[in-house]
Amino acid sequence: MAMYLKSQAVLTLIPQRYHALARKSNAGRRCSLTPNSATASQFFQKAASSTSTKPPGPSDADVRSPASPSSRSSLRPESIPKPPQSPPVQGQTSPGSEVLPPDHESSTPPPPPPPPQGPKSSRLRKLLYLFLTAGLAYAGGVWYSLRSDNFYDFFTEYIPYGEEAVLYLEERDFRNRFPHVTKQINRRVTVPKDEGAQVTIPSGSGLSWKVAEEQQEATDMTKKGRRMGTAHANEPTKDIKVAEKAKEEVKSKSAAKKEDVAANIPIQEDLEPQPAKAEERNLDAPRQPAVPAATTIERLVQDKVDEPVVQDLVKVFNDVISVISADESASKFAGPIAKAKEELQRIGDRIVALKKDAQESAQEEIRNAHAAFDKSAAELIRRIDEVRTQDAAEFREEFESEREKIARSYQEKVNTELQRAHEVAEQRLRNELVEQAIELNRKFLSDVKTLVENEREGRLSKLAELTANVAELERLTAGWSDVVDINLKTQQLQVAVDAVRTTLENSDVPRPFVRELAAVKELASNDEVVAAAIASISPAAYQRGIPSAAQLVERFRRVASEVRKASLLPENAGITSHAASLVLSKVMLKKQGLPTGDDVESILTRTENFLEEGNFDEAAREMNSLQGWAKLLSKDWLADVRQVLEVKQALEIIETEARLRCLQVE
């Protein structure tokens, strides 16, 4: 900052210095300072480069403005040494004017300091980051609302302007996906109505005051229906105001509809006019008026035509008839009106025929389009079915080949294991037979020795008894073969059961035991009890495996923590209830021992104690007594425990059956 102030002071003193030197050297002469020297230009370039760093603005309170050289600057013009005067240059127009070179010592200022960092920039940066983060979060919420229905409900209900933003994006997406819909809507442009030429009504048409005073009141066809008799037309006028009112209405209607009449009534030259029907006269009238009554013209009725254009044309024509009927010279227009009626009737019939033809052609095109679409759809379905059938055949062949490979590999493994087990059992049986033969020989020798000694003592008195013993030994030796076969099968069954139990107990992860179970089933093929026990095991259990006891306990601890979090939730819980239950579950104290009660914490404590004791049956019963969210969360764990219990029960039944066989042999 000090260097910057010093450079500003030097730049301020430069013009004053030159001005003071010029005044002292050329007193009373005209001073013309022109910055044409190379030294002056270099000085100004260095000064400008030294001050290229933007100084702090006047709004910064910590930075003061540089002081003027006349008041606060420490550098005075008098303290600057004067350079020697340069010799006069030839050809100079003003002998007294000169340009002094700047001082080179002060032209090299030190490097400018770094600009100070104000606190406002950091605040603006934080505010900008906050706005960007909020905008990104809002945009992300709008995008995720289009993907998730649950988040859509939350976002549109609790976020301001969330519903409008989501609806706007959905509308934009709809317009991008179906652009032809908006184009068809924009194509519906209202066609301007051709008003046609103006129609001039004669000045003598309409009602007059003489008709209201002398003649009977004319019938208002727009209010009385489509057809009226002459008896209503001959009724006397009761009030002059009624005629004046009718005259004003007729004039207003004629002025409003005169342009529509000229535009909507088509001119057909090929139609011949037909004479109008003469109206029936009422012969029972009490008297004849002095002035003939106004002729009433029958209005046109088009009930069969539903076209809006024809109905509007008929309405305009009926208004014209009403205007003519209200005039005293209505009889003059009876013929043209009748001709116009016939032409309008023909026009309506022609429009109906054209509409019917257009509808029939449109229906024919629709039927043709439907037939073509059905044909193309059937062809497409046929192609899809062919491709699907081909793919299914290829997939079936691949599946059969893979299944055969897998079955072959598993069969080889099973045969290898069975062969090894059979060899081990046979070797064990041979060893036992050798031991039993040795024992029998030893007993036989001891018996023979005893008999020989007894014979020696009894002098052949017990020879018959010795013969009986030998026969008994032969019988026992012959019966031992059956015992050996039964023992062999029992031992093989026990080995297979031990293999299943070892597989279940020594596996760190659930492993399938299909091969071991198949070996047990093959060894006990004639035993119905073993077959029923194997059938009671779920196929998913021996195909995927079952967890061990340690895995069940570890998983129960994780499930128990989640059940404690949801223990305080009602049936129809929301976000607030979930949050409250999560917070309160952290505060709840765990029970110890065997607590009594049906609350979630007591049930979890008892279940954990039963699991530590190895009593999975009671643990499953305790967890099955849970209700609501707790039971829903522990559903998968209960299914695993049930599979473990089913497998253990089946293995216990098979082991019991094997022991029973041994007892039967004994």
Curated annotation (Swiss-Prot):
Residues 25-122, 251-287 are annotated as: Disordered. The keyword Transit peptide applies. Pfam families: Mitofilin. Residues 1-19 form a transit peptide. Keywords: Coiled coil, Membrane, Mitochondrion, Mitochondrion inner membrane, Transit peptide, Transmembrane, Transmembrane helix. Residues 20-126 are mitochondrial matrix. It is found in: Mitochondrion inner membrane. Residues 64-78 have a biased composition (Low complexity). Component of the mitochondrial contact site and cristae organizing system (MICOS) complex. This is MICOS complex subunit MIC60. It comes from Ajellomyces capsulatus (strain NAm1 / WU24) (Darling's disease fungus). The lineage of its organism: Eukaryota, Fungi, Dikarya, Ascomycota, Pezizomycotina. The gene is MIC60.
